[in-house]
């Protein structure tokens, strides 16, 4: 079997690595991939992930059996539909179903209609309307841009001044939809769920992401500065409740409304005093949650995808070890940052997943905001954390930073 991974980040590096381990897979390709994937996949960086026709031509020319789409943009732009219409199997939803990530408003309206627990919300359609709303709304307030924003389109405002600044920041133009949400307090967690129509199978291991740029959850939101799994202080009963009240109902709601979803639904949830509630949905694996979950997963991912396609029972096997991933990012991220700084001290092995590196001559240099995820495994989260930071410290660069508290919530509970 030949499998093509679409995407260039750490999530796709982890997907390629995991698919490459499958005994039923003969060859893995990556478009555009990155320079760190060359040991596990045939990398075709000459094709852009936005060039859907070229991806289709490549898949047909190379007799690709399955395409796994990693990032959100190609899903929302309809790559899965194009490939499926050419009778190529795809793990990832079509454009219509990918709206669950592509539009915050679509997701909120669906949850509202089907009474899926989430924060109360208000929709506004212009900068002026938003500025008026924040003059009198309850605080704190969460401000979300309706479309995609690479994990950086969310502002939490604790003061009236912050709320006004947030609106001005999100509204670069006068018109556009923004969703205001009441602020939810509690412990956040990420639940990946396999979905095929109304058949939904959540992973029975959750992960916890760290969205803020700096220690102690300070600074702006990012795409994710680290993650770990399992989450020992959130017990199995919470997972069961999340499945019953969120995962199953949202799959059924999507099917009922005619939005045919096949792929991975990411449920970003928060455990409040009233139980789990939805913060966001994504139409694909989280990054960096994918890297830690796929490191811990012992099951054959390709076989699980085929079982999902056939609506067969899915059983997950996990390593006993905990996994912690620490993201090293370019200084300045999630704002502006310099590229082209040399980065060394790491091997292309299972201790690292690469997001934003490229090879220039014999050296690797940074080419993105999030650069490389250092992985640690151990019998406890604490031991896995120590190993992850040991691997992070081995990386040499004058232009990287990382958080020092990834996994602390599991250790201090």
UniProtKB/Swiss-Prot annotation:
Family label: Belongs to the GARS family.
Domain ATP-grasp: start-end pairs: 108-310
PANTHER family: PHOSPHORIBOSYLAMINE--GLYCINE LIGASE, PHOSPHORIBOSYLAMINE--GLYCINE LIGASE, CHLOROPLASTIC
Catalysed reaction equations from the record: 5-phospho-beta-D-ribosylamine + glycine + ATP = N(1)-(5-phospho-beta-D-ribosyl)glycinamide + ADP + phosphate + H(+)
Protein keywords: ATP-binding, Ligase, Magnesium, Manganese, Metal-binding, Nucleotide-binding, Purine biosynthesis
Binding site for ATP: 134-190
Any GO molecular function: metal ion binding
Annotated Mg(2+) binding sites: 280, 282
Cofactor: Mg(2+); Mn(2+)
CC cofactor note: Binds 1 Mg(2+) or Mn(2+) ion per subunit.
Protein name as it appears in the record: Phosphoribosylamine--glycine ligase
Pathway listed: Purine metabolism; IMP biosynthesis via de novo pathway; N(1)-(5-phospho-D-ribosyl)glycinamide from 5-phospho-alpha-D-ribose 1-diphosphate: step 2/2
Biological process annotations from GO: 'de novo' IMP biosynthetic process; purine nucleobase biosynthetic process
EC number from the UniProt entry: 6.3.4.13
